[in-house]
Amino acid sequence: MNILKKCLPLVLCFSMICTLFCFQTVAGATAYDETISNGSFADFQQALLNAKEKGTSNHIYKIHITKDLRINQSVGIYSNTMIVVDKNVKIIRNLPAGDGGTTFRIGQPGSSASGYYYKNITIQGGIWDGNVRSKDTGFCTFKVNHSQNVKFLNMTIQNDLEGHMIEAGAVNGLTVSRVNFKNHKCYFKAHKNKNDYYEHEEALQLDVNLYETTAIGNYDKYQNKNVTVDRCNFINLGRGIGSHNSIDGCYFTNMKFTNNTFKNIKSYAIGAINYRNSRIQNNKILNCGSGILFVNSKPNYTGYTGTYVVNNWKLKVNSSKDNSIISGNTITINSPKSKDSRALYINGNKISKPAIYKKGLNSANRLSGYQGYLKGDHRINGLTITKNNITVKNMTAVFYKGIRNSAFTNNNITFNGNQKADYYGLTMDSVPDQLNENVTVSGNKIKNFNSGILCKNSKKITFKNTTVYNSYKQHIYLEGVNVTIVGCSLDKAKTKHGIASKNSKITLKNTNITNAKEFGLYSYNCSGKVTGGKIANCGKYGIGAYKKGISYSKVKFSNNGANGKCNYYRG
């Protein structure tokens, strides 16, 4: 009896634990508000309407799909809704042939929604198939506008036609994680410049609410912000992430593109226009037409359509620091698709008065404005590019224009192509009234290009501890710049000159220049000073200074060819 009394509490306790455990299991199994297991489109539509009526911030209405489902007309998804599709289950677009409508939209066309109106929407799992047929016209799979806290998780979106797989405008808090975007299709039937049109279509478009094709609800100046795209795959597409429109003075903030893979993209993998406080990190970009574009407003780049000014919104140019970073990316481009292709294309500009290229905006949105730029300093300000590995063939790797207060550090850049072709590892080129300014280039390795670095129309530029070798024409070309070169190494016998310069002010410190076929440092109409370092094994002079002199001290000259020990010449 005593033993029974002692055991009874333990038995009761164990029984309570089992009961609780069983309850939790049952509750977990019935967590969905509705399950669509019969493939009925009508049932799915009704479930979405139920979610619209019953879902709240405290109770997200969960719809579970367990069997393939055909979508017969455009579908609206509303706040506080979660759609979960089982693995390998297909959601198949089956709209009437020739219907170019969006398959899934957040909200209702013609609504007055504005700001970040719709909220708490999750799409998870499954294969969302565009099911392109011969008579179909272009469509988007998902369109998200005026929303917040929207998630796309663990799913595949495939077979889109001449549209975007996800198009988002005016979204605060968009998460796209572990999503496979693949197989964009285009018939090229109705377009004069077929390839250019194809390349307009980003799989994930982060757009502005300017046209009826992008806006559900009001046309307003609310921008995308707090967007995360992580661990996604982009395969066989026109473009990866980005947009081909921008509104001057409208900035996207806290945009994070991390750990994604891009393969076989015809145009660029990532296009960032007017971004602030953003990160593009640890992505793999393989066999794409271009790599990463980071620009303020529209550059002169193939495939972009326009930057617009909207008078109604009274926006201003924000010239404060971008505070953005591009780092840890692997970019390999062997088949550039145009003369403008770059692994990294960084572009800003400075506008002294409003630039109007085309008056008027689309009449449907009842906004006044023009295609062009606001007056102001649009140069990229405070961008860090670091620890990227770049390999290219028959193209310039990195292009800088209109950059200030920025850093380019610890990047590896390699060329695999015909060195006689006029391609550069790093081009820092601008125009006299839009100078690159206060830029540090440090700790980089650049090899096998026709010319390693080109720098023009720039001031307060510092090259530090950077190695450039095996260039064909020259390691560094300078024109119209104020530049300091410290602790760099310029080597290998193929190059004509170590440094070639024109109309510049040069400060060269503790830099080694070796094995140039002609001059270690060739300068025309330049001023400056060379201190320390060595200039050795050059075919002609160590320093050849024409029209103006270059002074030097504590430089070790050895084995330079012309006139034996003559290392300095002024013509």
Predicted regions and their residues:
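Sec-dependent signal peptide cleavage junction
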Residues: 18-31
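Extracellular beta-strand/beta-solenoid scaffold signature
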Residues: 45, 71-73, 95-114, 133-143, ...
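Hydrophobic core
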Residues: 12, 16-21, 83
